[in-house]
Amino acid sequence: VTRFEFRLHPVGPDVLCGLIVFPFEQAKSVITQFARFTETMPDELNVWMVARKAPPLPFLAEEIHGKEIVVLAVCYAGDPDEGMKHVEALRQFGSAYGEHIGVQPYVDWQQVFDPLLTPGSRNYWKSHNFSELEEGLIDTVIEYANALPSPQCEIFVATIGGETGRTKP
């Protein structure tokens, strides 16, 4: 690509957002449901799946810290009441360790993960694009997420939906 055009759209100032944290033992079910859910979610909703060891989040019991988890990071940029209907569907993916979901300024949500990416920690990101999460890929994600070399490592699947998912190359 040598050039592309994009159009900005207003967001917020507030969005419905947060995390739902599931035990890693439920990874296959949660990730499979996530994959199917993202195929039909509305443009106002974005959900990322993260597999990692639990950081010391204040809404998780202390005995969960350091355990393998699957996280759904949710952001709904529309009417919060409508967004809660989608959050409720995500809650049904399994039996969560905990969650922290609510309305907050978009600029706060945009920075919420910054403490996990501290300067000097040699952050390295590598990406691949997939049109869908097939069962074999889900199994591979689970296999490697179960063997991450440090508590700072994670595997995440970021959805790029909306118009980008509907536009043909």
Regions found by a protein language model. Name each.
Residues 1-169:
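Soluble FAD-dependent oxygen oxidases
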